[in-house]
Amino acid sequence: MLVIEGLTCRFGSKAAVDAASFSIDRGSFVGVIGRSGAGKSTLLRMLNRLAEPSEGRILFEGVDVTALQGRELRQWRARSAMIFQQFNLVGRLDVLTNVLMGRLAHVPAWRSLAQVWPEKDRALAMSALDQFDIAPLAAQRADQLSGGQQQRVAIARALVQEPDLILADEPIASLDPRNTKVVMDALLRINKHFGITVLCNLHSLDLARSYCDRLIGMANGRIVFDGAPAELTDSIARELYDLEADDVMGSAPVHAPIGALVPQLGTVAA
């Protein structure tokens, strides 16, 4: 279980996240929603320790994540894989090598520097690419891919980290509707088939309601809603999004898939 206690992040006198407290059970798919600047990205970056909390604690399975340093902190960052809006791929490297970067915490430094990857890791990376129908692109440069393809590569890279938790920060913000569905389906597949907890920042309420089993709403750095998607009424949503409400509530729902293919990578969730 992930437990957040009074988590706060200040930049000068402004609190980007203000006393956030909640807990998340293993295997959940949680959407973090709210208008731009609500504190969603800062919250996820604190959970991965890319941003340092000013106050509060992050506990995972009883371990105080906020106290981790050095090797233990690097191990935590591998266990809590980040997926970014900007993809964060190395454009000049091929797709397979970009995915293998997710194995950095599992191999000696000289192997990654020399790009001499163990065969088992290469097989793992290819299996991850195959999960998202991009294995044929393994030898292609990352900067030659479409935005949707690049985000699927980033998700495959996160999966080979063998994480307990995936933190997706606006993963579909720059994508068209077709690629948005492909990427959200990929995250749902990871969650349902591998039992990996997913915490995903989303701007679209339709997507959040379709894919997530729980929503956490933020406004001005504070958590103002925490519940099932069905509990988020339009009136609450309009208060949450204020002037942006018409933009995030105006499109038709994108329904989550009823079924998915049997995975080939890792352990299937019970």
Swiss-Prot record:
Binding site for ATP: 34-41
Topological category with respect to the lipid bilayer: Peripheral membrane protein
GO molecular function, one term: ATP binding
Keywords: ATP-binding, Cell inner membrane, Cell membrane, Membrane, Nucleotide-binding, Phosphonate transport, Translocase, Transport
Domain named ABC transporter: residues: 2-245
Predominant localisation class: membrane
InterPro entries in UniProt: AAA+_ATPase, ABC_transporter-like_ATP-bd, ABC_transporter-like_CS, ABC_transpr_PhnC, MetN_ABC_transporter-like, P-loop_NTPase
Cellular component GO terms held in the UniProt record: plasma membrane
Function: Part of the ABC transporter complex PhnCDE involved in phosphonates import. Responsible for energy coupling to the transport system.
Family note: Belongs to the ABC transporter superfamily. Phosphonates importer (TC 3.A.1.9.1) family.
Name this protein carries in UniProt: Phosphonates import ATP-binding protein PhnC
Gene name for this UniProt entry: phnC
